[in-house]
UniProtKB/Swiss-Prot annotation:
Residues 435-485, 503-533 form a coiled coil. Residues 418-438 are annotated as: Fusion peptide. One of its GO terms (biological process) is entry receptor-mediated virion attachment to host cell. A lipid is attached at residues 565, 568 (S-palmitoyl cysteine). Disulfide bonds join 87-499, 121-152, 192-245, 258-267, 353-370, 410-446, 491-498. The chain crosses the membrane at residues 553-573. Residues 185-226, 261-288 are annotated as: Binding to host receptor. It comes from Avian leukosis virus subgroup A (isolate RSA) (ALV-A RSA). Glycans are attached at residues 79, 120, 141, 158, 178, 257, 291, 297, 307, 315, 391, 453, 501. One of its GO terms (cellular component) is virion membrane. It comes from the Viruses. The record marks 401-402 as: Cleavage. The gene is env. This is Envelope glycoprotein gp95.
Length: 606
């Protein structure tokens, strides 16, 4: 122990023995500063004591070596995000978490947020899509868009995170759908929300740099000394407006309650009048203007007629129907108490903002637009496609015949006849030749099935070995690249680091392997031809119905046979009876003739 302390204090290790450990330290030369003992002086003692006191006052603990070390990086990331499919991007060596994922909107239910919110969202309010509530006797067109539920759930999040959620760079995200059918609105329509401090004149067209510059130049708007997290997309011009958040394709009629003040017009609760007629303000943006007290005749999304009247209208009032409006969203106040710390989202649910995503809500977010959704691969896996096909509609499925596979006990010894045997058998016994041919075909089918089963089993074992080796290579390569990046070595330091080509024919191999297995199953024995015919005739009927129809068909065949054969049987029986009677009568006549010829009386005949 003393040797270790000595090596630590002197700055260089050395071999020491028990005898050397008892001796005093060797005197070092002042000319060699590297071998000068690092023994603390009086000034160093004062500095060490001051640092310890400062750490005790500020609450900084010195036992950081007792913190639990993190486990596997990718397993930790998958457990925290609920996402198991991801890939590393080698386009930038300094961004190892840049993924090959895209964001997709997903229906949000309160059951998914159980345990993550403090209360339920019971009263969400409604949105009107056809006309505002100012009209007297207007059409009832109220609905609840998704942004109300999203904003309510975000404000009620109560599970805080220790650190800020990791930002994921996405390839992009899917836009929200437009409303093309007012009777069928999906559960993801209108789910965009934005974040801003209360009262800040925010604009969705701002980039990340513009938003950051505004917050730095106007600190009074933020009303907080803590920094904000800008969640606007990097390529914000691709993820904004109706192209990203969706739009309402029909006209929305709104009441313009305007009064003329000199040569200007004041509309609604405007602070100051503006120049220009309200009609021009409406038609300049593609709207349709109707003066007050006139009728509005609309045919889409459904036909309705309503008067452009309301209470307490000004002398320049009217109705404006604008088309192609962006679906309404909501600005969430990012200075509220629920956003002062990063909040956790349920697994597999992400805050998606264009080409950026978080598995949680960063502290004091600003910007947008964003929605809650999930992540998926740009090119889905073969298993994902199979799941979609299985869960899709099952209409138009062809019914297979009730053939049974050849078992392992079938005979695979194929013994073909020679030319001489075939010629004599075909001339002398054609039936025997046909029976022999059918038997050999059956044995040949059995041999083919067994050979194909052995081949597929062999290829399956090889495929498992190749897959395990591939996984091991990819894991080792990811670990090596990440360790090099963690130590500051990029693509320019290590040759071939960012160019790692590993051929992937697993999908093609899996398809061919599956085709081989399906091809083997095509050889079978039709054990129930009548049942197969009935299933093909009547479609998807159950087995009990097949057995019932087979019984009825058998009874019908028996009845038909009786109807056809019974007259013949009756005719044969009647003929035999008639023949017996005729024979009996003929015998009796001959007997009488013989009796008269012999002159014997009839009474003496016994």
């Amino acid at each position: 122990m003393e040797a270790v302390i000595k090596a630590f204090l002197t700055g260089y290790p050395g071999k020491t023995s028990k005898k050397d450990s008892k001796e005093k330290p060797l005197a070092t030369s002042k000319k060699d500063p590297e071998k000068t003992p690092l023994l603390p002086t009086r000034v160093n003692y004062i500095l060490i004591i001051g640092v310890l006191v400062l750490c005790e006052v500020t609450g900084v603990r010195a036992d950081v070596h007792l913190l639990e070390q993190p486990g596997n990086l990718w397993i930790t990331w998958a457990n925290r995000t609920g996402q198991t499919d991801f890939c590393l991007s080698t386009q930038s060596a300094t961004s190892p978490f840049q993924t090959c994922l895209i964001g997709i909107p997903s229906p949000i239910s309160e059951g998914d947020f159980k345990g993550y919110v403090s209360d339920n969202c019971t009263t969400l309010g409604t949105d009107r899509l056809v006309s505002s509530a100012d009209f007297t006797g207007g059409p009832d067109n109220s609905t609840t868009l998704t942004y109300r539920k999203v904003s309510c759930l975000l404000l009620k999040l109560n599970v805080s995170m220790w650190d800020e959620p990791h930002e994921l760079q996405l390839l992009g995200s899917q836009s929200l759908p437009n409303i093309t059918n007012i009777a069928q609105i999906s559960g993801i329509t209108g789910g965009c929300v934005g974040f801003r401090p209360q009262g800040v004149p925010w604009y969705l067209g701002w980039s990340r740099q513009e938003a950051t510059r505004f917050l730095l130049r106007h600190p009074s708007f933020s009303k907080s000394t803590e920094p904000f997290t800008v969640v606007t997309a990097d390529r914000h011009n691709l993820f904004m407006g109706s192209e990203y958040c969706g739009a309402y394709g029909y006209r929305f009629w709104n009441m313009y309650n305007c009064s003329q003040v000199g040569r200007q017009y004041r509309c609604g609760n405007a602070r100051s009048p503006r120049p220009g007629l309200p009609e021009i303000q409406c038609t300049r943006r593609g709207g349709k203007w109707v003066n007050q007290s006139q009728e509005i005749n609309e045919s889409e999304p459904f036909s309705f007629t309503v008067n452009c009247t309301a209470s307490s209208l000004g002398n320049a009032s009217g109705c404006c129907g604008k088309a192609g409006t962006i679906l309404p969203g909501k600005w969430v106040d990012s200075t509220q108490g629920s956003f002062t710390k990063p909040k956790a989202l349920p697994p597999a649910i992400f805050l998606i903002c264009g080409d950026r995503a978080w598995q949680g809500i960063p502290s004091r977010p600003v910007g947008g637009p964003c929605y809650l959704g999930k992540l998926t691969m740009l090119a889905p896996k073969h298993t994902d496609i199979l799941k979609v096909l299985v869960n899709s509609s099952r209409t138009g499925i062809r019914r297979k015949r009730s053939t049974s596979h050849l078992d392992d006990t079938c005979s695979d010894e194929v013994q073909l006849w020679g030319p001489t045997a075939r010629i004599f058998a075909s001339i002398l016994a054609p039936g025997v030749a046909r029976a022999q041919a059918l038997r050999e075909i059956e044995r040949l089918a059995c041999w083919s099935v067994k050979q194909a089963n052995l081949t597929t089993s062999f290829l399956g074992d090889l495929l498992d070995d190749v897959t395990s080796i591939r996984h091991a290579v990819l894991q080792n390569r990811a670990a090596i690249d990440f360790l090099l990046l963690a130590h500051g070595h990029g693509c320019e330091d290590v040759a071939g680091m960012c160019c790692f080509n590993l051929s992937d024919h697993s999908e093609s191999i899996q398809k061919k392997f599956q085709l081989m297995k399906e091809h083997v199953n095509k050889i079978g024995v039709d054990s129930d031809p009548i049942g197969s015919w009935l299933r093909g005739l009547f479609g998807g009927i159950g087995e009990w119905a097949v057995h019932l129809l087979k019984g009825l068909l058998l009874g019908l065949v028996v009845i038909l046979l009786l109807v056809v054969c019974l007259p013949c049987l009756l005719q044969i029986v009647c003929g035999n009876i008639r023949k017996m009677i005729n024979n009996s009568i003929s015998y009796h006549t001959e007997y009488k003739k013989l009796q008269k010829a012999c002159g014997q009386p009839e009474s003496r005949i016994v």
